[in-house]
Amino acid sequence: MATSVVVVIFTVRQGSLSVLLIERAAEPSQGQWALPGGFLHEGESLDAAAKRKLEDETGVSDVFLEQLYTFDQLGEGRADIVVTYFALVDLARTRMRPDSEWRPAWQPVH
């Protein structure tokens, strides 16, 4: 059974609420947008994985992070269980590091 975490990362940007989305730069998902996330490392707890993904994507640690919802049985080629977390970060503290596989972008929440 595969388990992954997804972190819904919010910030206030130019006076409005924004969420971090990742544009996939490599196949097979090139051009698609996704929430930051990934699979657990062996022996890693859910909370530790969510904190790792938050820091990997934003450079931020020690912020509000809470488990939000768990999805299961998502279909072939996907994790069997996806645990979603909610984070609220200070935009001024973030350090985005795009690479050849993904490009982060803050998108307004309407």
Q: What spans do the regions from the language model cover?
A:
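N-terminal strand-loop-strand
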Residues: 1-34
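Active-site segment of metal-dependent pyrophosphate-handling enzymes
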Residues: 1-5, 18, 47-110
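Acidic-residue sensor for enzyme active/binding pockets
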Residues: 23, 44, 57
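Active-site donor-binding loop signature of nucleotide-sugar glycosyltransferases
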Residues: 24, 37, 109
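Short active-site-proximal "capping" loops at secondary-structure junctions
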Residues: 25-28, 40, 70-73
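Short histidine-centered catalytic/ligand-binding loop motif
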Residues: 35-43
